[in-house]
Swiss-Prot record:
Top-level taxon of the source organism: Bacteria
Subcellular location: Cytoplasm
Protein name: ATP-dependent Clp protease proteolytic subunit
Gene coding for it: clpP
Catalytically driven reaction(s): Hydrolysis of proteins to small peptides in the presence of ATP and magnesium. alpha-casein is the usual test substrate. In the absence of ATP, only oligopeptides shorter than five residues are hydrolyzed (such as succinyl-Leu-Tyr-|-NHMec, and Leu-Tyr-Leu-|-Tyr-Trp, in which cleavage of the -Tyr-|-Leu- and -Tyr-|-Trp bonds also occurs)
Active-site residues from the entry: 98 (nucleophile), 123
InterPro entries linked to this entry: ClpP, ClpP/crotonase-like_dom_sf, ClpP/TepA, ClpP_His_AS, ClpP_Ser_AS
Record-linked CDD domains: S14_ClpP_2
Higher taxonomy: Bacteria, Pseudomonadati, Pseudomonadota, Alphaproteobacteria, Rickettsiales
Organism for this UniProt entry: Wolbachia pipientis wMel
Record-level GO cellular component terms: cytoplasm; endopeptidase Clp complex
Pfam families: CLP_protease
Subunit structure: Fourteen ClpP subunits assemble into 2 heptameric rings which stack back to back to give a disk-like structure with a central cavity, resembling the structure of eukaryotic proteasomes.
Family: Belongs to the peptidase S14 family.
HAMAP family in the cross-refs: ClpP
Length: 208
C-alpha cells in the first residue's frame, strides 16, 4: 500500500489538510506517474480541465514518470492537452516510455524538459488477440491504424519526417535526455529549477 503524505495548512478558518498531490494541483502541477490506464487518465483529464477553468492563461506543469500503458487512455490525455487553452509544460522525471514519451513530446513547444538522468523510450504499439481468423484480421488492421496515428503525432511534435519516425519506432528505442533532445522529443535538459524560464520571462538578478 502506497502512503501518500498529507500537508496541513493554516487558513483563516483553521487547519486544512491536503494529500500532497492535491496540494501541488493548487500550484498547477500535475503528476503522470505509473502505468497509464483509464482511471488514471480520467483523473489527469479532470485536473487539466479544472486548472483551465481556474485560469485559462496560466501554464500547467506536467511531471511524467511512466512506463506507458493503454493507448486510448494516453490519447485521452494527449487530446485534452491540445484542447485546453493553457500551455502545458512537460518534465520527465525517472522515465517516459511508450505513451509516456508521447505525452512528454506533446507539451508546448519550447517547454518540454527532462532531468539529466531520466530515460526515454519510443516504440510501436503492441497487442494480441485470439479468436476467429476474421476477427484477428480486424484487430490487426486496427493496431496498424493506431500505429500510423501515433507516428503522425510524433511527426507533428518532433519535426522529423514520417519515414524517420517509422524507422525509429520499429523496435524499442531507449534514449538518454540529450539523445531525446536531438530528435525533438524534448527542448532542453535541465539540472536545476533555475534552468527553466517560467512563462518565457527571463529574470536576471544582478548584484551591485
Amino acid at each position: 500500500m502506497t502512503l501518500i503524505p498529507i500537508v496541513v495548512e493554516q487558513t483563516s478558518r483553521g487547519e486544512r489538510a491536503y494529500d500532497i498531490y492535491s496540494r501541488l494541483v493548487k500550484e498547477r502541477i500535475i503528476f503522470v506517474t505509473g502505468p497509464i490506464e483509464d482511471n488514471m487518465a480520467s483523473v489527469i483529464v479532470a485536473q487539466l480541465l479544472f486548472l483551465e477553468s481556474e485560469n485559462p492563461n496560466k501554464d500547467i506543469c506536467m511531471y511524467i514518470n511512466s512506463p506507458g500503458g493503454v493507448v486510448t487512455a494516453g490519447l485521452s490525455i494527449y487530446d485534452t492537452m491540445q484542447y485546453i487553452n493553457p500551455d502545458v509544460s512537460t518534465l520527465c522525471i525517472g522515465q517516459a516510455a511508450s505513451m509516456g514519451s508521447l505525452l512528454l513530446a506533446a507539451g508546448t513547444k519550447g517547454k518540454r524538459y527532462s532531468l539529466p538522468h531520466s530515460r526515454i523510450m519510443i516504440h510501436q504499439p503492441s497487442g494480441g488477440y485470439h479468436g476467429q481468423a476474421t476477427d484477428i484480421e480486424i484487430h490487426a488492421n486496427e493496431i496498424l491504424r493506431v500505429k500510423k496515428k501515433l507516428n503522425q503525432i510524433y511527426e507533428k511534435h518532433t519535426g522529423n519526417s514520417l519515414k524517420k519516425i517509422e524507422g525509429m519506432m520499429e523496435r524499442d528505442k531507449f534514449m538518454d535526455p540529450e539523445e531525446a533532445r536531438k530528435i525533438g522529443l524534448i527542448d532542453r535538459v535541465i539540472a536545476e529549477r533555475t534552468d527553466i524560464e517560467i512563462e518565457n520571462i527571463k529574470v536576471k538578478q544582478k548584484v551591485g
